[in-house]
């Protein structure tokens, strides 16, 4: 199930105010899609809207917290009333959390899981039924992470949330096939990407030192790919119908290493962690 021509398609991107979400919104707009953008920080959408408008595109913007089921449903009701079912839903909104498991407060787990997992669940429950009922080729893209496949130390909450997104995507994809739906499902697993998610010090456990955080941020800045690389991969997956997309530095090698030897993968992850002072 692929969608070669995106002109006039209605595409919703969550977390569109920055990073991968912003780049994805601009990438789809360049393909001629009508964009529906939402973000917890409504003001962050203004420059994205302006960039799309200045390039001759069209979009609507909405301040929405994806953790709030009722708010996501209100957005869906508005979107459906305005133009019917979406053609593409990109569940991108997410947050990172850095910290050893024993140093991470339970509240940090709740925030991470509510945003990264329940945010996707709310998006699916609010938009997928109409997409399925409308018929025609449509697609859901869930943005997970390489961390859901090859977890690193001090990322237990984030890794667990992204692993859940991968499992959720796989299971729902099979259900869609069982009912012969024309809605396809793609899960995107970015590797090292240099975005603001790594620079948000609010999402860092008390046990992480300033030096450790600085080393990690320097590593992401030096080795991380640009968000636009992920955005192009998302657009490409919608056009080709790919179900799993690994993108960015280290994503494919670590994915295949995990399949070959989990023991060797763990050794590699420990070596990298020690290089950044996490020991």
Residue ranges and their predicted role:
Residues 33-47:
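Conserved glycine-rich Rossmann-like NAD(P)H-binding loop of the short-chain dehydrogenase/reductase
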Residues 100-101, 105-110:
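Substrate-binding pocket helix/loop in short-chain dehydrogenase/reductase
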Residues 42-43, 63-74, 106:
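The beta1-alpha1 cofactor-binding region of Rossmann-like NAD(H)/NADP(H)-dependent oxidoreductases
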Residues 145:
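Residue(s) in the substrate-gating loop at a strand-loop-helix junction
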Residues 10, 17-18:
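Conserved glycine-rich cofactor-binding loop
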Residues 177-245, 249:
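SDR active-site lid
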Residues 124, 161:
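Active-site helix of classical SDR
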């Amino acid at each position: 199930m692929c969608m070669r021509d995106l002109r006039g398609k209605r595409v919703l991107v969550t977390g569109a105010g920055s990073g991968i979400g912003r780049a994805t919104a601009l990438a789809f707009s360049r393909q001629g899609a009508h964009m529906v953008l939402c973000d917890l920080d409504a003001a962050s959408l203004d420059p994205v809207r302006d960039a799309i408008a200045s390039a001759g595109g069209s979009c609507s913007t909405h301040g929405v917290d994806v953790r709030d089921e009722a708010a996501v449903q209100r957005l869906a009701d508005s979107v459906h009333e305005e133009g019917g079912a979406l053609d593409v839903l990109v569940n991108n909104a997410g947050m990172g959390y850095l910290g050893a498991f024993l140093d991470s407060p339970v509240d940090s787990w709740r925030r991470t899981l509510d945003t990264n997992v329940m945010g996707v669940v709310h998006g699916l429950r609010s938009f997928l039924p109409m997409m399925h009922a409308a018929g025609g080729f449509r697609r859901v893209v869930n943005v997970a992470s390489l961390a859901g496949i090859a977890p690193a130390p001090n990322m237990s909450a984030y890794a667990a949330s992204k692993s859940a997104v991968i499992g959720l995507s796989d299971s729902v994809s099979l259900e869609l096939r069982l009912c012969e739906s024309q809605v396809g499902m793609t899960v995107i697993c970015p590797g090292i990407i240099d975005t603001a998610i790594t620079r948000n010090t609010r999402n860092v456990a008390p046990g992480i030192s300033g030096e450790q955080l600085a080393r990690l941020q320097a590593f992401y800045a030096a080795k991380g790919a640009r968000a636009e690389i992920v955005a192009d991969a998302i657009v490409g997956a919608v056009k080709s119908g790919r179900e799993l997309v690994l993108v960015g530095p280290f994503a494919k090698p670590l994915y295949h290493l995990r399949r070959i030897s989990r023991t060797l993968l763990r050794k590699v992850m420990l070596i990298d962690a020690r290089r950044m002072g996490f020991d």
